[in-house]
Amino acid sequence: MTQLQKYIWLIDTIRRAGKISLEEISSRRERNKDLSDYKPLSRTTFNRWKDAIFSQFGIIISCQRSGGYFYYIENPEDIDEDELKKWMLDSFAISNLIGENLSLKDRIIVNQIPSAQSHLATLLEAMQGNRVVLITYCGFNKKRSYTFPVEPYCVKLFENRWYLLAHNVSYNKIRIYGLDRIESLELTDNTFKLPKDFSASGFFSTYYGIVTGNDIKPERIIIRAYHDHIPYMKSLPLHASQRLLEEHDEYADFEVYLAPTYDFIMRLLHTGAMIEVISPASLRQTMKEWISDMYELYKND
């Protein structure tokens, strides 16, 4: 287990416990051979890990001295309000848990994410130095690949695929590229200036996923969820802007503010008859057209 994984394990152990003594932390560590070789955690090692965690993650592990010496995360909001940090910590924590339970490998099922590790590492290096990247790319709807320079702005994980948002130098347009469709990628010595007003979260704030474009404007959308789908909508919102308008025995109305792009429409269709678009009328009509086209495929059965 790497040193980073040990730090993540300690953060996760304290987060899940709320408050926990050093003795209990050491006891849990001793039960994990990869972490300890069954040896106790010394106070010196614990303090060193605690300081490293603050240095690397900005996470403060404090001690409550009244009623016993119990350690806790002093600033949990720094984790909960930072989506990237929370995702990273949760991902490492899950990885650690699975690593501790490899004997259950035939009883743990995960979705396969198209490999993007090598490209992702190079792109992050390019983003660190604002360096132009030369990519060879073949889109799903293309018969051949093309090589061109891009200025990498940000990367995004969406529905088990990694995507790159970049400025296409040749077309002078912002485009999105799937990392699993990149055939080759090369760092160049050319650099670029990231626009001062660019914000990755801001750019995607009114989009459902990775389909973007100036031709579709964000708007207020009301979606009605029926029966058993209501708690699913509450527990896993469609979008960060989602809010509950009203709830009844048979249905609940939710509001989102976003651009009704292709991937959002596909998400609504995926839910079937458990939801209904109430407004705007234009999106409701689009849904009717898709449903009508689907009906045509099956009407002769």
Identify the residue ranges that each predicted region occupies.
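Short, basic/aromatic recognition patches that contact phosphate-bearing ligands
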Residues: M1-E83, D293-D301
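Short, hydrophobic/amphipathic alpha-helical patches that form generic packing surfaces
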Residues: K6-T13, L89-A93, I265-H270
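Bulky hydrophobic/aromatic content
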Residues: I8, L22, F57, S62-G139
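Short aromatic/basic micro-patch
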Residues: K19, P149, I176, E255, ...
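Residue-level signal for tight coil/turn positions that link beta-strands
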Residues: R65-S66, P152, E159, L179, ...
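General beta-strand recognition
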Residues: F70, L134, Y163-L165, D253, ...
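Core beta-strand-centered patch of the WYL/Sm-like small regulatory domain
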Residues: R107-I222
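Polybasic (Lys/Arg-rich)
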Residues: S205-D301
